[in-house]
Swiss-Prot record:
Protein family per UniProt: Belongs to the thiolase-like superfamily. FabH family.
Catalytic residue positions: 112, 238, 268
Subunit structure, as described in the record: Homodimer.
Annotated GO CC locations: cytoplasm
SUPFAM superfamilies: Thiolase-like
Domain remarks: The last Arg residue of the ACP-binding site is essential for the weak association between ACP/AcpP and FabH.
Keywords, alphabetical: Acyltransferase, Cytoplasm, Fatty acid biosynthesis, Fatty acid metabolism, Lipid biosynthesis, Lipid metabolism, Multifunctional enzyme, Transferase
Organism: Staphylococcus epidermidis (strain ATCC 35984 / DSM 28319 / BCRC 17069 / CCUG 31568 / BM 3577 / RP62A)
Pathway: Lipid metabolism; fatty acid biosynthesis
EC class of the enzyme, as a word: transferase
Protein name, per record: Beta-ketoacyl-[acyl-carrier-protein] synthase III
CDD domains named in the record: KAS_III
GO biological process entries: fatty acid biosynthetic process
Length: 313
């Protein structure tokens, strides 16, 4: 059975925050932020918008694109590090709002790698034969856990969501190869502080890890798929920092024009990062049926995940 994406949707909140905003209260500048990160702006949700709201807006688009009804969904997996509350899960909340029926639901916490983890998990359930359509969502409201007094992190993060309906696809399409991994010894480099409830990051250590693992994991899944870098039509890395992305691209041996870049518009949106980038390329007509994509993410944990997928239903 070939398992892939049958429907796609994405959502970014309406509030656009440019770099000049931070010049009002932090010792920084648009020039510095752009040069060091590649970020020009990011979208932030309203205070009364929850992660489940972002997830819902992306999900209804994915279900419609798949040509099915909510009742046809057999399971919901949400990748998020910023649930509305500790429990119930965002997936539980989505199940009720979408009207899917009393299906299995779970949130998956792998930070910025979460969308990769969740797609790979859904693939296994579908291949087991027990589930036909699984809704996979990557959604985060990072603005609520960002320390606005910390210049090194305040400028980096945005809010958003992306969703896919996964199921059986045509011969030759779908997920070809994948990899997931973690290194708990690096957990201290990127975490949510218990006392403040805000994100903390050792930028230097995360940068070193990300450059190495994004390039290496991408190379391994391409080789596992029996392909070479020349066979890749689009490289979609986690949109954390343009310098990390460029380094990973170079390690993989992909031309610059084959790398998706949306970090300038959305910043780092964690689990929503890769689907938001895919959405941009779909809108720009850069993804066509039977194109081969490499998706790769890294995140707190430290975690990583990579997928080679042949696009098309």
């Amino acid at each position: 059975m070939n398992v892939g994406i049958k429907g796609f949707g994405a959502y970014a909140p309406k509030n656009i925050i440019d770099n000049a905003y931070f010049e009002q209260f932090l010792e920084t500048s648009d020039e510095w932020i752009s040069k060091m990160t590649g970020i020009k702006e990011r979208h932030w949700a309203d205070e009364d918008q929850d992660t489940s709201d972002l997830a819902y807006n992306a999900s209804i688009k994915a279900i419609e694109d798949a040509g099915i009804q909510p009742v046809d969904i057999d399971m919901i997996i949400v990748a998020t590090a910023t649930g509305d509350m500790p429990f119930p899960s965002v997936a539980n909340i989505l199940q009720e709002r979408l009207g899917t029926g009393k299906v299995a639901t779970m949130d998956q916490l792998a930070a910025c790698s979460g969308f990769m983890y969740s797609m790979i998990t859904a693939k296994q359930y579908i291949q087991s034969g027990d589930y036909k359509h699984i809704l996979v969502v990557g959604a985060d409201k990072l603005s609520k856990i960002t320390d606005m007094t910390d210049r090194s992190t305040a400028v980096l993060f945005g809010d958003g969501a992306g969703a896919v309906v996964m199921g059986e696809v045509a011969e030759g399409r779908g997920i070809i190869s994948y990899e997931m991994g973690s290194d708990g010894s690096g957990g201290k480099y990127l975490y949510l502080d218990r006392e403040t409830g805000k994100l903390k990051m050792n930028g230097r250590e995360v940068f070193k890890f990300a450059v190495r693992i994004m390039g290496d994991a991408s190379t391994r899944v391409v080789e596992k798929a029996g392909l070479s870098s020349e066979d890749i039509d689009l490289f979609v890395p986690h949109q954390a920092n343009i310098r990390i992305m460029e380094s990973a691209r170079e390690r993989l041996g992909i031309e610059r024009e084959k790398m998706s870049v949306s970090v300038n518009k959305y910043g780092n949106t964690s689990a929503a990062s890769i689907p938001l980038s895919i959405n941009q390329e779909l809108q720009n007509g850069k993804i066509k049926d039977d194109d081969t994509l490499v998706l790769v993410g890294f995140g707190g944990g430290l975690t990583w995940g990579a997928i080679v997928i042949k696009w098309g239903k």
